[in-house]
């Protein structure tokens, strides 16, 4: 479970195995005052990764300003048969965007309308989470 300074979690289902995933790793950047609580340490290994900005997003959590440069982007699902859930939060953990990105044909509902791409405006300290086994590419606009 990942908690912010208010004890609110925003990645618990991705990390606790509640939802099945074909991924065996995630990238995670802990910001100031965030805690990672690991309950089953025998099943987890932690390795530091170099911090550099990217526009290629796999499953994980990304901090704008540390992992991704602020700006306007088109977020595209680049994997042919995969689906990703892209969520964007502001620095107070308020949801700004929640999109299902896929190139597959899927049924839409009133609340879920999958699409291959979406435009996003991201600011320093915004948080992007990607859940799924595909790759999401951010193209600067």
Which residue stretches match the model-derived regions?
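Short, solvent-exposed S/T- and G/P-enriched segments that are highly enriched in secreted/extracellular
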Residues: 22-24, 57-71, 114-117
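A short beta-strand element within beta-rich, extracytoplasmic domains
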Residues: 68-80
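Primarily secretory-pathway and cell-envelope proteins
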Residues: 2-53, 80-141
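A short tyrosine-centered beta-strand micro-motif
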Residues: 1, 62, 73-75
